[in-house]
Regions:
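N-terminal capping/lid subdomain adjacent to the active-site entrance of alpha/beta enzymes
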Residues: 1-117
């Protein structure tokens, strides 16, 4: 199966700060990925690493994925990617294959309807 791969970055300020034992987070950054199959089935995934160095690594790795990709190639090479990217790809593929069904939220749909996506 051939897939079309698209990504859209986001960055927004959190309404309240989020703390863990090491860091306080004021913003959320990442990407929404969209995979579209030959038969126009669509799957989405979110890439949202917490650490700045992981965010940079994910940016580089997402740019390695071509716009047109075979599902076999993606499945074979998924292990080279950061775990956040692996999770996003697996989520998108599962949605395409009907293994998971997400309710589309207004916020996500607004993001997706942007001209680039």
């Amino acid at each position: 199966m051939n897939l079309i791969f698209k990504k859209k970055s986001y960055n927004f300020k959190l309404s309240t700060k989020v703390k863990n034992s090491k860091t306080t987070y004021l913003t959320k950054s990442g990407w929404i990925i969209k995979l579209t199959s030959n038969d126009k089935k669509i799957g989405f995934g979110e890439v949202s690493p917490l650490l700045e160095e992981d965010l940079k690594q994910c940016a580089k790795q997402l740019n390695m994925i071509p716009e047109y990709v075979r599902v076999f190639n993606l499945s074979e090479q998924i292990n080279i990617f950061h775990p956040c990217i692996q999770s996003a790809i697996n989520s998108a593929l599962a949605e395409i294959n009907g293994k998971i069904i997400f309710k589309k939220t207004i916020t996500l749909m607004k993001l997706i309807k942007q001209p680039y996506f």
